[in-house]
Amino acid sequence: MALKPDIFIVNEVIGADKIQSYRDMGIPVYVVRLSTNIEEVKNEIIKLSVLVGEEQRGKVLVKKMNDKLARIERNIPKELHYSKSTVLVSANYTSYGGKGCMYDDICKHAKIRNGIADLGMNTGQTVNKEVMIEINPDFFFLAKPWKDNKAKDEKLLGEFLADKSLENLRAVKNGNVALLDEKYIFIGHQNCVWSVQKLAHLVYGDCVTLEPEEFLKGF
């Protein structure tokens, strides 16, 4: 409060009580909603840029996102579009990954199939071993913490591959089980374009070159 802000910009995850406490201080509050797809991210950027009087910078940032998404799509041969299926496995969020979440939309932009959504499951429904077996995907992505820990990463991958109930699934037999940083999965800002690049590269290989990742800005 010593800074005497003109407005508070807060994320809805802080909770209604905290948000109301800011409003009770007499300062306008803008609540950023959790984005469930890339289009919502773009819309939020434009709304925020207008709010702070920097609409042109917002437009520049959205253009950067669109240009990078278009580059990724151009590099994936059309005959490969949606030819491979994936399943996201998250030990901490076992009900994440179906229709209506950011991961599902990232898959769409990467031109890969989200096996969980293909099964008709919405995000919020549990992805257990029975679901994995029914889908029998081409790729498994195992969500790992943002902070690298080689021992824990190897343990996570080793335990999954050692599961006898999964050993005959296509992704396991073909060696297509990959660790995926959570920063590519649980993301609600402009760098979600790098998530699209990462997934497309993991599935379709070198036709999608890995551009160096940077935090995208509107200037």
Write out the residue ranges for each language-model feature.
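Short gly/pro-enriched beta-turn/loop segments at secondary-structure junctions
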Residues: 80-85, 100-102, 109, 134-135
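Short, solvent-exposed loop/turn elements at domain surfaces
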Residues: 95-98, 142, 149-150, 187-189
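Extracytoplasmic substrate-binding proteins
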Residues: 17-95, 116-118, 172-219
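Alpha-helical, coiled-coil/dimerization segments enriched in small aliphatic residues
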Residues: 99-124
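Acidic/His-rich segments in extracytoplasmic proteins that coordinate ligands and/or metal ions
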Residues: 1-51, 128-165, 201
